[in-house]
Amino acid sequence: MKLINVFLLSLSFMLLFGCNKGAGTFTLEGVITDASFNQPLTGATVELYGISSGNNQYALVASAVTGEDGKYAFTFDRTRTEKYTLYVKKNQYFEQELEVYYSQLKLKEINIRNVTTAAKSWVEIKIFNNNAANNDHLQFIRQQGKIGCSECCFSGINHLYGFQDTSIFCINDGNSLYSIEYAVFGTSNTGILGVTTTPFDTTVLNLTY
């Protein structure tokens, strides 16, 4: 009887520590880079959310604020989570998000996820029409610049008719080129214009026709 009790006690310890070992923890680390100034991004808020299997609801797992080295580090329990989403936010910077699937994470290893973002900047496309006529037709399209964001300008061809002096504001990555290709119908006036936009500010791009 005594041997049976010892065996059962040993089995209980094995199950207890075996389960704890099986649960384990993940370590997720990385560096947030500021592409506008080519350096680590200080003071960025990094948040990790997990979506549980079956209910599609996100819950905050961990959060941190980057120091001068731009680094963040999370250690969190392995749970029944389908995937995680990493959010990077800072005022006057483009918010970034990165999906990290549960199947991609490894135990007993440091899982590296680096993220790059850029300072916000703006271009003012300032259009002047000299000697305007009702049948004037200007078209232009973005050739290079920020695309694919909720704040980004229309990516197709822009048309202006008749007498129109106007300004169009578009967002861009700071310290990056923003250029347009334009053409005035019925004339030889065509070309490409571009400026490098100043971070946190508005840079003027003049288009005269």
Language model segments and positions:
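Extracellular beta-sheet/turn segments enriched in Thr/Pro/Gly and aliphatic residues
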Residues: 101-120, 124, 190-209
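Short, acidic Ser/Thr/Gly-rich low-complexity loop/linker segments typical of extracellular
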Residues: 54-71, 147-164
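Glycine-centered loop-to-beta-strand initiation motif
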Residues: 30, 66-77
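Short strand-edge motifs at loop-to-beta-strand transitions and within beta-strands
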Residues: 72-74, 111-113, 165-167, 203
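A short, solvent-exposed loop/turn motif at the edges and junctions
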Residues: 79-105, 183-191
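Short, ordered, surface-exposed loop/turn motifs in non-cytosolic proteins
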Residues: 37-54, 131-150
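Bacterial Sec-dependent N-terminal signal peptides
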Residues: 1-39
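A short, amphipathic beta-strand motif
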Residues: 28-34, 70, 121-130
